[in-house]
UniProtKB/Swiss-Prot annotation:
Residue segments, region Disordered: 1-29
GO molecular function: cyclic-di-GMP binding
Entry similarity comment: Belongs to the YcgR family.
Origin species: Laribacter hongkongensis (strain HLHK9)
Keywords: Bacterial flagellum, c-di-GMP, Nucleotide-binding
Protein name in the entry: Flagellar brake protein YcgR
Function of the molecule: Acts as a flagellar brake, regulating swimming and swarming in a bis-(3'-5') cyclic diguanylic acid (c-di-GMP)-dependent manner. Binds 1 c-di-GMP dimer per subunit. Increasing levels of c-di-GMP lead to decreased motility.
Length: 271
């Protein structure tokens, strides 16, 4: 595929704005990501070209994380500083993306987590199909650290996190939340709805996660991000991304055992 493309069929001649500020979710915002960031336009262009060559799926979060599309990067034009990517399968999610001022791109080519942020995008036609155009990001973050490699937990037999010090509205304490995915550094929890007391930065000191054969592990968690996902049945699912804090080596070793077990089970199913 030719890596240059025409932008004469755009609905507007204005360039999408380039965002300012540091990257945030889905990576933990407390992490110092500067040493993992590429800022050279040439280096950024080369890395995005590798993503195109690898033909990997890219998730684009828009509308403050409330909407997302799955896409693939199509082409890069270093001269104009733009790149093109496929439109998503959902018309509503595509409309949300067009209205969004800040969009987060996340993918994992060759096991290397890549994240970058763009400003508004524009719709146009690429090779006869609907696509989007955006300015190249000012920086791209690459992470190859294992604590960010999350693996989804079994759907049929979900594992749970018991947040013993969660204050319920009726004055009681404690809530049990299914774990959607987990890594050495944190996990995503599924909420029963829009519930209070889960503000960003909130820390719960008295939690336990039930990991079946591995056992129950005591953990402390900090709420790092919130996400509303559209499920296949059309219903919304609310999740919070949590980071483990004050984690000791015993808990980390047990987590590593559980994640390795999930990876083995997944490979067995694929064989």
């Amino acid at each position: 595929m030719n890596e240059t493309f025409s932008v004469t069929d755009l609905s507007s001649d204005q360039d999408p704005a380039v965002p300012h500020g540091s990257h945030s979710a889905p990576l933990p915002s407390s992490e110092d990501l500067a040493k993992y960031a590429m800022t050279s336009p040439l280096e950024i262009g080369q890395h995005l070209k590798r993503i195109i060559s690898a033909n990997v799926l890219v998730t684009v979060f828009s509308n403050h994380g409330k909407s997302f599309i799955l896409t693939k990067l199509l082409a890069i034009d270093l001269k104009s500083g733009r790149f093109a990517f496929d439109a998503g399968s959902s018309d509503d999610a595509n409309r949300q993306l067009l209205k969004s001022e800040r969009n987060v791109f996340v993918c994992t080519p060759d096991g290397i987590k890549t994240q970058f942020v763009t400003g508004p995008v524009q719709s146009f036609i690429y090779d006869g199909a609907p696509a989007f155009l955006a300015r190249l990001p000012p920086e791209v973050v690459k992470l190859q650290r294992r604590e960010y490699f999350r693996i989804q937990t079994p759907i049929a037999n979900p594992v749970v996190c018991r947040v013993h010090d969660y204050p319920n509205p009726d004055g009681s304490a404690g809530i049990v939340l299914p774990i959607y995915d987990i890594s050495l550094g944190g996990m995503s929890l599924v909420l029963p709805g829009e519930i209070p007391g889960m503000e960003l930065g909130k820390i719960f000191r008295d939690c336990s996660i039930d990991l079946r054969q591995v056992g129950s592990l005591p953990v402390e968690i900090e709420v790092r991000n919130k996400l509303v996902m559209q499920q296949k049945n059309g219903h919304e699912q609310r999740r919070i991304g949590c980071q483990f804090v004050n984690q000791n080596s015993r808990v980390q070793n047990q987590l590593q055992r559980y994640i390795a077990q999930l990876e083995r089970e997944r490979r067995t199913l694929l064989d």
